[in-house]
Amino acid sequence: MALLGTYNHTLDDKGRLTIPSKMREQFKDDKVFISLGFDGCVDVRNEAEWLKWTEKVASTGQATAEGRALTRKIMSMSDETTFDNAGRIKISSILQNKANITKDVVIIGNNDHLELWDLKVWEVYIEQAPGIEEAAKNFEEKI
């Protein structure tokens, strides 16, 4: 089942974030993998999707400087955690800093993973991102 929707939540003083119960259903074994994402966000995956993702990252190749850099950046800033009894996950201070996450967080479902965005960073990203029609046109041209 795809992860969908947008939710606003608040990061507490201990760096914990409540994940909506509807989204937590995708994390049946409770293992949560958190990593630096693209475009200024933090990615959250269940174990099955994490294994698929790390396989893709590894396939970028260790033979090139770019492949090694991508692997190092993603893997060195990743963390494995679990949900606490209140449905919260802990976001490391390293990831909070890299993604400029302060207090107000936007949680979006992005098909196979969640993305965590600082509210202000998300608003700037959405404002600057291509409109859906433009993105669809560019997508069609690449097919």
Curated annotation (Swiss-Prot):
What Gene Ontology cellular-component terms does the record carry? cytoplasm; nucleoid
Q: Does Transport show up as a keyword for this record?
A: no
Q: Which Pfam families match?
A: MraZ
The source's domain of life comes to Bacteria
**By its UniProt entry, which InterPro entries does this protein fall under?**
MraZ, MraZ_C, MraZ_dom, MraZ_N, MraZ_sf, SpoVT-AbrB_dom, SpoVT-AbrB_sf
Fill in the subunit field for this protein.
Forms oligomers.
Subcellular localization: Cytoplasm, Nucleoid
Record GO biological process: negative regulation of DNA-templated transcription initiation
Q: Tell me which Gene3D superfamilies the record gives.
A: Transcriptional regulator MraZ domain
Domain SpoVT-AbrB, chain residue ranges per copy: 6-49, 78-121
Query: What protein name applies here?
Result: Transcriptional regulator MraZ
| Chief location bin | cytoplasm
Q: Does the keyword Repeat apply?
A: yes
Q: Give UniProt keywords alphabetically.
A: Cytoplasm, DNA-binding, Repeat, Transcription, Transcription regulation
Which GO molecular function terms does the record list? DNA-binding transcription factor activity; transcription cis-regulatory region binding
PANTHER family, per database record: TRANSCRIPTIONAL REGULATOR MRAZ
Q: Which family does it belong to?
A: Belongs to the MraZ family.
